[in-house]
Structures are given as structure tokens and as C-alpha cells.
Amino acid sequence: MSMFNKVVKEFQWGQHKVRLETGEVARQASGAVIVDVEDTVVLATVVGAKSAKPGQDFFPLTVDYLEKTYSAGKIPGGFFRREGRPSEHETLTSRLIDRPLRPLFPEGFYNEVQVVIHVLSVNPEIPADIPALIGASAALAVSGLPFNGPVGAARVAYIDNAYVLNPTRDQLKASSLDLVVAGTERAVLMVESEADQLPEDVMLGAVVFGHEQMQTAIDAIHELVREGGKPEWDWQPAPKNEALIARVTELAHGDLLAAYQLRDKQARSTKLKEVYAATSAKLEEDAQAAGTVAADKATVGNVLFDIEAKIVRSQILNGEPRIDGRDTRTVRPIEIRTGVLPRTHGSALFTRGETQALVVATLGTKGDEQIIDALEGEYRERFMLHYNMPPFATGETGRVGSPKRREIGHGRLAKRALVKCLPSADEFGYSIRVVSEITESNGSSSMASVCGGCLALMDAGVPMKAHVAGIAMGLILEGNKFAVLTDILGDEDHLGDMDFKVAGTEQGVTALQMDIKIQGITKEIMQVALAQAKEGRMHILGKMTSAVSGANTQLSEFAPRMITIKINPEKIRDVIGKGGSVIRALTEETGTTIDISDDGVVTIASTSSEGMAEAKKRIENITVEIEVGQVYEGTVLKLLDFGAIVNLLPGKDGLLHISEIVNERVKDINDYLKEGQQVKVKVIQTDEKGRVRLSAKALLNEAAASQSDTPPQQ
């Protein structure tokens, strides 16, 4: 009899067969599930602490998605030959898994939970992110932790006007949509997508299609839990302190109401801090008078936050003005300025209300492309977008350093929004880096990065296919009443039930990201929200088009210029030289950057047109074919007993035999030639090994013959 209580469930899912198993591996974890999708195998584990730490006032969930290089049959690079810090892809996938799981833990559950997913085997055609999300959901479901799942997930492509479930990587290349959707049996919780200017109804259809198809995975997880699940935890939320809630409401409700009449963010934040401090102080006085212990600040803070949420939500649902005085459909005032930084290649300052992004575009060469060593193989990225949000953007102090998960995620969202509207590499040969520096933030800074990024690219002279704008939307739902909010503030993001970001052109959507915190948001509500988002996007596009009608026709004087020439691929090694000596000398002496592709396309880039012209001339000289009959003015490099080595072109030498110098017999070559002497020679022979024979006397004989043919003058 086996020592393992192994449970396996298999199901057909689109074009793939999926296998879930639990009970054999990682048995000391709270829950562990292995997911196998056509040889892409992940191990998802969950460990939950049995109790919360004293004073804990938030839910400490961590999700780590880790790719092992052995899964692709590789050994890691680097000195230590082992996996190091998470890659950007691992960080983004960790966020992708975290987002639909987090809202399904019950309110008041503050026990630490850690989800770790290891990628153990990779089929290059099957991305591991969807199996990882399914595995994390299944591991939580079998663990018995208080979790209102399970969660299903699906990737949806759109090929030839049809939706495709969980496409392969090759299918994704032909698709105009890459959408990941996750949710429960009843509701969608998360959407992440990149699209090629698709209409809203196609995007919504993809979400609905994905939600329908993921039910197969959810059913399989239910079956796995029935046979291999652990007993459910006997966890109950701490009973609400009704007396404390009543007292805090009595002390603070009026002041909180007054605070939310202040339209300026800084003034409102100051007032709210005063209310929090005054309420805590008053409660401490009450406790001292009664001889009891006052409630801790975290508990009081949670009660105050709930009161804030009720105030803001009820005002909006009752049709009253929002926090900053707007109605539900109005976009904040927009100011646009381009060319703000004198020596950058392109720059824009995009301000929407109290959110501001300073965005800079830099043009580079092929050598500046990012080389990514992924499990499925190495590839290059010609377009990079990096998002930075320092603490001063919200008037706070904090750590400044390497980007956090949030910054990496926001940067990727902005990149998704812009990438489909960039010119192809054939149309515009530059590599491109965009950096968004958030200088002020009060909601929707990632969408400000999209708008500012588009404007900075146009300022840099990048011929964009269309203007791209982004807008962040919110939603508040109470029973049958709901309100969709255009261009949400930071506070509305925290207090709402859904936030979603839509970016696109006049023609359609290029990126859509949704995070839904509650169940019960229907297709009809999402339809209304997307229509209202389109209205807001069109308004912003109008402002952007008025400010910048199109890309600059001239590149910045500080941006590199490029010329491209084609050489015989067999001559590439001559241009590079032994150990790179020739190309290194070329770049240093001409001040250029030179990239050579395997098919012989040479790209020369420099801010100096003279340097580019010189580099081009020298490369043409190196790669020119030496043909019989051509005449060159060469330099004597070396004298030998039987002749001289003459340099014709850089890297091209020939032999001038002693018998080919003059017509008479030469006893001592030194009587006729010196090293460094310029000599005119004709190519009389070449062979398959590239050896060249030269003649000087042939030119003398030709000159004599032409003179004898000339009739005497009268």
C-alpha cells in the first residue's frame, strides 16, 4: 500500500489536456497541487499561519511565482550558476496570481498566508502563468483555509474574428488580443489584456468567453477538494465591537463629513489626520476615566475607514458631487506641455488634476535593445517602458531605490497600451525607451503615463500609428444601485468596488485591466462601465490631439541618426575582424555605433553625419569585391625577396611579384620600391582563397601602347 494519499483529476480544456494532483508532493504545506498542461508543470503550495500576529491590522498575503531554469533544460548564467532575484516576468506573474486571490479571503482574516509556485517543467508553446494561477487556486481550496474560491483562469486570443481558449505562443503571434481573465463560478475578478485597437464589445465578449470556459477548471478543483481536501479551518471573524463603533461614529462622523467637503487633496488629508488623532485621543480619555484599556489605534483606524467609505459611497450613489466636486462622468482638467527637457530626445509633461507625469523618450540603436533570457529562449525587446513613483509624488517620505512590484506592474500596463501603435522595426529602426516619472499622484498615474508616453514618443519623432490615451474608472455597487466613476481619485480607488483602466485610440482598445473586489458585477454593469470609459478616453484624446497633432518630422539634434547598408554576409567577419578588432577601431575612430545582422544588414548610428559617412565609406572599402582589371593606388606594406605586399583597401592586400614591377629584370627590389611608398597597380589575378596578384608593369605597357596609338600632332 502506498504511503501517499494521492488524488488526480484530469480534464480536457480547449486544445489542452490538464492534470491536477495532490497528496504526494509537499505534504507539510497547508495545501499543495501539481498542475500539468501538456508538459508545462507547476507546483503550487500554500502555507497559512494558524493565528494572526498580535496587533495585525491588515491581511499579509504574499505570492511568489518562481521559474527554475532546469524546467527548460538550462543551467543559469552568472558566476554562481543558480537562480537569483526574480525577473520582471516572474514579478508580473506573481501580481497576476495575487490580484484575483486576495479579495476572496474573508474580511478580518489577518493570518499570514504565503503562496509559492515553482515552475518545474516548461513546454515552450504553453505559458506557465495560467497553470500557476489554477494551481494556486487549487492549493488554497484543498488547504482548508477560509477562502471563498476556487478561482478559475483562462487566456483568450482573438484570431480571424473568433475567440481561442488558452492559445499556444505561435497562435498568440497571430492574435490581435492577449487577454487573461480570472474569476469564480459567479463573477469575474480580474482582467489583464493587450489588444490591437479592438472595439469594446469584442473586449467584453472575450471576458465573458473566458469566464464561461474557466468553469471546467473550477469544476475539476471542486472534485479535487471533495476527494483530497483537508478539513476546513474553524475560523470565525472577531465579533464587532458595536460599542466602539457607536462611540467612534458619534465622535467622528460629523468631522469626517466636513473633511469630505474639502475639494483639495492636501487640505482633505490634513483634516482627516486631525480627525483620526482627535478621535484616538478622546477614546483614551474615555478609557482613563472608566479605568479600562483604550482600543488600539489600528482598530480605531479600521472603524474610521469604514465610516469614510460609507460617507463617500452614499454621497455618490445619491447623486451628490464626488470628493473633488465633480459629477460621475467629468474628467479632471488637463494640461499638456511637450519638449520640456532641452537635451532629451523627446519629453512631455502631462497633468490631469492632481496627477502628473513627466515622461521622457530616448532613441537608441539595435545594440540598446533589451536581451531577455526567458525559459522559452532568448529574445530581444526594442521597446522598453519604465515607471517610477517616488514618495514625494504623494507628499510623503519613503524608500527610494529599485522598483517595487507596483511600479513594475504599472510600467507593463503602460507598455501594453502603447506597443501596438508603435511603427515596426522596418519603418523605424530605433530601439525606444520611455521613462515615466510620476511627480504628483492622486489616482490613475499609470494612465497618465500612457498619455504622457504617447506625447513624448511623438515629441521624439516616433511616427505613432495613432494617439493613445488611458483612463482609470471606478465603480460603486450597493444592492441594485451602482455608479460608474470616470477618472477616479486615489481615495475613490480605495473605497470603491472595482477599478479598471482602459487605454486605446479613437479606433479601439489597446489595453484593459480590471480588478474587482466584490462578486455580483454583471456583464451589463461592465458594458456600461466600458462605454463610459470610451467617452472619457475620447475626451482625453481630443485634448492630446489639440496639443500635439502628430509626430515631429525632425528628430532631436541629440538623437542618433541612422543609415543602413547591405553587405555580402560572407564579408561580415572582415568587418568585425579578429576578436572584434576592426569594428572596434571603426566605432572608436568614427564615433559611431555599428550593428550587423546575420543577413548582412549594417546599421550605422551617430549624432555626427560626418562620422556616419566615414564609417560607411570604410565599411564599403572593407567589403568591396576585388575584381581582375581594377586599378588601385596602394601602399607598400612589406618588401620581400620575390616581391612586395601592397595594401589596396583596409584589410585588402595583394602581392606585387618582382617580375610585375617593370619590364626589365629586377635584381634588387629596393632599387624600385620602399615601404610606405604609394604605387599604382592593376589586379591581374584572384583565386578562391581570396589571394590577389598585382602588376605595375601592366599599367606601364598600357600607357606606352596608348601613346603609340596616338597620331602625331601637325
Swiss-Prot record:
Where in or outside the cell is it found? Cytoplasm
Which residues of the sequence carry a binding annotation for Mg(2+)?
493, 499
Q: What is the lineage of its organism?
A: Bacteria, Pseudomonadati, Pseudomonadota, Betaproteobacteria, Burkholderiales
Could you tell me the keywords of this UniProt record? Cytoplasm, Magnesium, Metal-binding, Nucleotidyltransferase, RNA-binding, Transferase
Check the record and name the Gene3D superfamilies matching this protein.
GHMP Kinase, N-terminal domain (3.30.230.70), K Homology domain, type 1 (3.30.1370.10), Nucleic acid-binding proteins (2.40.50.140)
Known catalysed reaction(s)? RNA(n+1) + phosphate = RNA(n) + a ribonucleoside 5'-diphosphate
Query: Which gene carries the instructions for this protein?
Result: pnp
Report the sequence similarity comment from the record: Belongs to the polyribonucleotide nucleotidyltransferase family.
Q: What CDD domains has UniProt attached to this entry?
A: KH-I_PNPase (cd02393), RNase_PH_PNPase_1 (cd11363), RNase_PH_PNPase_2 (cd11364), S1_PNPase (cd04472)
Task: Cite the NCBIfam families for this sequence.
Answer: polynuc_phos, PRK11824.1
EC number(s) stated in the UniProt entry for this protein? 2.7.7.8
Which pairs are disulfide-linked?
Answer: none
EC category name: transferase
Q: Which cofactor does it need?
A: Mg(2+)
* The UniProt record lists the keyword Transcription regulation: no
Supply the name of the protein.
Answer: Polyribonucleotide nucleotidyltransferase
What is the protein's known function?
Involved in mRNA degradation. Catalyzes the phosphorolysis of single-stranded polyribonucleotides processively in the 3'- to 5'-direction.
KH domain boundaries:
560-619
Indicate whether Phosphoprotein appears among the record's keywords.
no
Q: Which residues form the S1 motif domain?
A: 629-697
Matches recorded under SMART domains: KH (SM00322), S1 (SM00316)
